[in-house]
């Protein structure tokens, strides 16, 4: 199955179990890691992309990502610094991936926050905020994940 729109994307996310949704969401957020230089976010996503991550490891990663999210929010300031805003959205997306259970809403929120991060970066670079390219990249990423995992 090749995913080509949000309806198919949502259906594919919904069909996965919690572990599969966590791994898929982590991959989607990893696509926007170039927008964040926070090692806590990167480390947490690397952890939860693995099927064998323990609950204790995920709990530690969740605490680290929460701190990163709070710190990134305070860096956004009032001047609409789009690059800082992008990094904040990456942290918010990562936080969805380190919840104790990643249900459909969490995975979908992670995807949406990743799209928002890319929109912010696009605004910072050229004044054009579009999430279409990121959505299309997510379709490709989720399709590849489903093929690799046999889902």
Which ranges hold each PLM region?
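Structured binding/interaction patches within domain cores
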Residues: 1-151
